[in-house]
Amino acid sequence: MYIRVADMKENTVKTDDIHYISESIYQKIKSYTISTEDLYITVAGTIGSVGEIPKVFDNANLTENADKIVFRGICKKFLMYCLLSNFVQSQIKKCTTKVGQPKLAIVRIEDLLIPLPPIKEQYRIVHKIKQTASIMS
C-alpha cells in the first residue's frame, strides 16, 4: 500500500481509495515506510497536516511529500495536538521555503519548539481536549 498526501485527511489516512505501487517502485522506496506507532506530517503542497496511521496502513509506503515522526516517551495524541496547535503551525508557516513548490525540510521539523510537560500531564491534557471536543460536537 502507498499513502499519498491526498489520503491524509482529518488527522488520519482515509481508507476509501487505497493505492498500491508496482514491484519496481516498491524496490526503490521499500525502506520508506510508516507504522501505526508514528505520526505523519505533510511537507510539500499542503504543509503541516498531521495525523495518525490506521492499522490497515501499518508499515505502508509513504509519499515523499510527508515525513514520519518517530518518538519515544511522549504521548502520541499529545504530540499530535501540539503539532496541530496554532503555536506550532505558526512556526511551520514561518520556516516553510517559498521558492518553487512550498516545502518543509526535515531539519526545520527537528527545530520546532514543542512544550513538553511530564508524561502524566500530557495524558491529562489529551483527556481534557477529548472531553472538550465531545462537548462541542
Residue ranges and their predicted role:
Residues I53-K55, C95-K98:
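Short amphipathic beta-strand starts and helix->beta connectors
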Residues A6-T36, V56:
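Sequence-specific dsDNA recognition surfaces
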Residues Y2, Q27-S31, A60, N86, ...:
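Conserved structured core elements
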Residues Y2-N11, Y32-S49, L62-A66, F71, ...:
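Short Ser/Thr-interspersed hydrophobic loop/turn segments at strand-loop and sheet-helix junctions
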Residues S90-C95, R108-S137:
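Amphipathic alpha-helical coiled-coil/heptad-repeat segments
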